[in-house]
Amino acid sequence: MANVSNCEIPENLLYFIEGKNTVWAKQEAPDVIVVGITDIAQTMAGKVVKVRLKKKGTKVERGKPVATMESGKWAGPVPAPASGEIIDVNPDVEKNPVLVNQDPYGKGWLVKMKVNNPEELKQLVTGSAAVSKLTELINSEKLQCKRL
């Protein structure tokens, strides 16, 4: 795992990076991904106080929200890294939103999706390319990641 300015960047994950929006996807099967926000995103948001997840069965286009989040300094959507259908949600983050801050790559996962076209996942960045892109964002925002 890469660590840049205290921000953890697991190189085995796939990343959807659009401006300051950084979402990770973990492939569980060729057409199934688990989705969450990065350490960078949770640091930029600050303490997350509310998470609203789209319902199971919701069809989502790439870049459209799978969830919305609110913190003291930010409210906004969490974009889908690929088009597909939400097949599972993490009820724990709705009850205890700070999990997103405490464990963004583990207990703070948001939704599980069945991807329409697994080829679409090839558009996401991973490995050293992801570390490089996310390092640029960390540096441009002068970030020091921290967990709550």
From Swiss-Prot:
Keywords from the UniProt entry: Lipoyl
Superkingdom in the source lineage: Archaea
Cited SUPFAM superfamilies: Single hybrid motif (SSF51230)
Species this chain originates from: Sulfurisphaera tokodaii (strain DSM 16993 / JCM 10545 / NBRC 100140 / 7)
Keyword Cytoplasm applies: no
Taxonomy of the source species: Archaea, Thermoproteota, Thermoprotei, Sulfolobales, Sulfolobaceae
Similarity section: Belongs to the GcvH family.
Alphabetized InterPro entries for the sequence: 2-oxoA_DH_lipoyl-BS (IPR003016), Biotin_lipoyl (IPR000089), GCV_H (IPR002930), GCV_H/Fam206 (IPR033753), Single_hybrid_motif (IPR011053)
Gene name, Swiss-Prot/TrEMBL: gcvH2
Quaternary structure note: The glycine cleavage system is composed of four proteins: P, T, L and H.
Protein name per the record: Probable glycine cleavage system H protein 2
Gene Ontology biological process: glycine decarboxylation via glycine cleavage system
